[in-house]
Amino acid sequence: MKYELKDDYIELFKLLKVLDLVDSGAQAKMIIAEGYVKRNSEIETRKRAKIIAGDTIEVADVIIEVII
């Protein structure tokens, strides 16, 4: 799956919401805090991590490529 950035970055929890991978912001924050999300193959626990073009996000079996 690809996500095209509209700005310079998007916060991680907002990306999960925009792509409908979670039902709410609270759920997004919970799965991030519990270590279920990887950024560039490393576990990312910062809910507001700035995701930029070139990043790859993994949630369960979904892989998201962030592009410009």
Language model regions located:
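A detector for short, charged/polar N-terminal pre-domain segments
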Residues: 1-7
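Well-ordered beta-strand positions in beta-sheet-rich domains
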Residues: 2, 48, 63-65
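A cross-kingdom feature marking charged/low-complexity
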Residues: 53-68
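Residue-level marker of intrinsically disordered, low-complexity segments enriched
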Residues: 8, 16, 62-64
